[in-house]
Amino acid sequence: MNNNIINLIAAIILSLSIIFGWQYFVVKPEQKKQQQQIAVQKAENLKKQQLKALVEPATGIVVQEESQVQRIKIESESLTGSISLKGLRFDDLILKKYKQDLSKNSPEVRLFSPANTENAYFAEVGLVSNLSSVKLPNNDTIWNSDSEILSPEKPVHLFWVNEDGVKFLVTITVDENYLFTIEQTIVNNSDKELPVQSYGLINRKYIAVEKAVNILHQGPIGCIDENLKEYSYDDIKDKKSEKFAASKVDWIGITDKYWLSSLIPDKSSNYSSNFNYALKQGIERYQVDFISPVQIIKPGKNFSIKSRIFAGAKKVDLLDKYEKQYDIKLFDRAIDFGWFYIITKPVFYAMNFFYGYVGNFGVSILIVTVIIKLLMFTLANKSYRSMKKMKNLQPEIDRIKNLYSDDKARLNQEIMALYKKEKVNPVAGCLPILVQIPVFFSIYKVLYVTIEMRQAPFYGWIKDLSAPDPTTIFNLFGLLPFAPPSFLMIGAWPILMAITMFLQQKMSPEPADPMQAQVMKFMPLIFLFMFSSFPVGLLIYWSWNNILSIIQQYYINKFN
């Protein structure tokens, strides 16, 4: 086989291996600070006890008791649910715009659930103190509210007064999307100084996540000291805890493929933050939390602090908006755009732009593919000419190989001299393929991780561009009443991709090496089985790209 082709195939395989394996096998070095503020250090042990008490419901509590607690109803265009007035916990949240699946009666996606339910998942913000004598609101406190409904048009005002006359006020607002703003105010009407710390936490009962493809992060995540921190559930389980002392915390949270819950603390100070794992009574729990330095509130003085909770769908434009509006560093990285971020995000923007005009992401993929093809036309033309020259030079190359078969150095020297004389670049034919690799993976990432592509239909039987083609040739595309095993789910679009790939090969210059020609003949069949389980949107892109390549090849053949 021609050495250049062998090297090309090896390079492509190596590239695929690196791209898929990088995020799974490479552990990013995490730098830890060694110093911590003295006030925070003194409060650390008590803080642990208080936060622990907050996240562990007492044994014996049942769901019926939880339902008896008064709640504030959440009602907006994007959300429905409620906030518990006991402990001021965000533990009941449903995303109104998203269904769990494509079935007719599918329920809406539930994000938060109370602590004593099967899929416990909730968020809190509050106050703790390094003095046990200070009476602060805790997880048993029943707050008073001026309203029963929280909506974008109507904030909710809460209050509670301790036995010393210290007043605690909380104002909660929600926007039309997924962002809650919580402002806590302490009015110290006592004759004592009050040392307090603000905290926030997100606690979740572990649910097994999708592990079919190791190019997607799910689990604890955050931006600390302007660096993205990502830990898988297994990472935190092994370490039990990952701590960051006195750091700039832009946001921390827990991310799924499409959903995010995140704490966004006030920017007025640094915070200690933790990613934790605990196993209690056979239940695995994960928690992310932050706590501020000690703030001393003098008698007769007030203190206010504002924090935010994001809980909802990871829409690209929405995260971009919040990142800019509230200066939340790297908030868009909650969407795992991956290694080719600088390409993947522009590809998404292009698709989303055309979607605004055509109203179908499948059609948008077709348009973006045409644009990419036009941008690469000159490169493809040069590549084709180089391949033709290489084929014409093959007899001369074979003659040189026979002549200098015992002298490798002279052989390479003579071949390079021939290339120079004929003005041929031996790798020029590889460039279009190599350039398309990042484009291919960028489109794959867009289809796989963006909420905009979730359950986005095309035409005909394609109801979800982010899922594999649901048909298979082995039951005649649904005409026969049985479901083949998953490895035989080879649908119409994978078959179309393989056919167009075969036709494209027929249009291209035939390899001079017989062995190489045989290998290339089997490539469509190999790719048919390899990519049948990939998102159908990717196969639409590839099939359309092949069709455009055939048209392009016809044009080049005719006019060159």
From Swiss-Prot:
Organism whose genome encodes this protein: Rickettsia rickettsii (strain Sheila Smith)
Topology class, membrane: Multi-pass membrane protein
Biological function: Required for the insertion and/or proper folding and/or complex formation of integral membrane proteins into the membrane. Involved in integration of membrane proteins that insert both dependently and independently of the Sec translocase complex, as well as at least some lipoproteins. Aids folding of multispanning membrane proteins.
InterPro entries, sorted: Membr_insert_YidC, Membr_insert_YidC_N, YidC/ALB3/OXA1/COX18, YidC/Oxa/ALB_C, YidC_ALB_C, YidC_periplasmic_sf
Quaternary structure, from the entry: Interacts with the Sec translocase complex via SecD. Specifically interacts with transmembrane segments of nascent integral membrane proteins during membrane integration.
Family designation: Belongs to the OXA1/ALB3/YidC family. Type 1 subfamily.
Subcellular location: Cell inner membrane
Top-level taxon of the source organism: Bacteria
Gene Ontology molecular function: membrane insertase activity
Segments passing through the bilayer: 5-25, 334-354, 357-377, 431-451, 476-496, 522-542
Keywords noted in UniProt: Cell inner membrane, Cell membrane, Chaperone, Membrane, Protein transport, Transmembrane, Transmembrane helix, Transport
GO biological process annotation, one example: protein transport
Keyword match NAD: no
Pfam families, per the entry: 60KD_IMP, YidC_periplas
The protein, known as: Membrane protein insertase YidC
Gene Ontology CC annotation, any one: plasma membrane
